[in-house]
Amino acid sequence: MDIAKRLIDYGFHAPTVSFPVPGTMMIEPTESENLDEINRFCDAMILIRKEIDENPDLLKNAPHTMKMIATENWEYSYSRQKAAFPTSYVLNNKFWPSVRRVDDAYGDRNLVCTCEPIESYQWDFHNLEYK
């Protein structure tokens, strides 16, 4: 999970984790990925592997949101630069995740519907307007 989340900081969509084998990542480059993109991905994986030894908190706290980086109080053992912009590519191509982490297991067991009540989706066909 940590590696998948850190990949977001490197500008990648996080790969599927724990499917089909628990404790693994399913990485599926497609025919639409060019060689430069695949090389960039491999470089990111190599750098993330080094981060595991140097400062595993970079992975444990990933992904780093704009709100997290912009906060006045920075209490981490690594720099904001290292957190949000781990490579020069990301400086010009940053994708900011809107949330940090979600407790997937809790969410799977405790589904909460945030939809409007079904009545709010009804049409008033007499006045032809959406309520």
Model-found features: residue ranges?
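Non-catalytic terminal extensions of PLP-dependent enzymes
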Residues: 1-131
